A protein has these predicted regions:
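Non-catalytic, conserved peripheral segments adjacent to functional cores
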Residues: 1-107, 126-128, 135-186
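Short beta-strand His + acidic residue motifs that chelate non-heme Fe in jelly-roll/DSBH
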Residues: 112, 120-125, 133
Length: 186
């Protein structure tokens, strides 16, 4: 039906996708995923799991990845606003350890395609956010890996939600315990 606009990012493989939105006095309609359109844009993957999470302002989730069952992901915000981040973990990549971030919101309707072998995370900037993501492999809880969100070797520049500092962020105990990128080599 509608075509998509695909923007390449500074890190090869990452893509910011803007769908065509059809709107009138009733509201709007958009295709969030069309295999043929994505394939034509160079994103030829088959998604097999669809997830959605809800979080309040100041929640930071990540940085997560799967070790033996890596996933391509297509992420978007259904309600609210987040700053979404991907970190390149591809062995031999010239951008290994580099990060890229993009503002995703219900208003801008942008989506972020993250290939396999990237760590992924986001911080909620609005009062509330619903986050949806498609994956090319199932979630394997015993295969999960992660990086500490504030690893100085990576240097993600997380924007802080209005009225909050880093100390106010809501981060799971597990996400606080992840090591840095140097620990992945061990």
């Amino acid at each position: 039906m509608g075509k998509i606009k695909v923007e390449s990012c500074e890190i090869e493989g990452l893509k910011v996708i803007t769908p065509t939105v059809f709107g009138d006095e009733r509201g709007y309609f958009m295709e969030t995923y069309n295999y043929n359109d994505f394939k034509e844009a160079g994103i030829d993957v088959q998604f097999i799991q669809d997830n959605q999470s809800a979080s309040k302002k100041g929640v930071l989730r990540g940085l997560h990845f799967q070790i033996n069952y890596p996933q391509d992901k297509l992420v978007r915000v259904v309600n609210g606003e987040v700053f979404d981040v991907a970190v390149d973990l591809r062995e031999g990549s010239k951008t290994y350890g580099k990060w890229f971030g993009v503002l995703l919101s219900a208003e801008n309707k942008k989506q972020f395609f993250i290939p396999k072998n990237f760590a992924h995370g986001f911080i909620v900037l609005s009062d509330y956010a619903e986050f949806a993501y498609k994956c090319t492999d199932f979630y394997h809880p015993n295969d999960e890996g992660g990086l500490y969100f504030d690893d100085p070797e990576i240097g993600v520049e997380w924007p802080m939600p209005e009225g909050m500092t880093k100390e106010d962020l809501i981060i799971s105990e597990k996400d606080h315990k992840w090591g840095g990128i140097k620990d992945l080599k061990k």
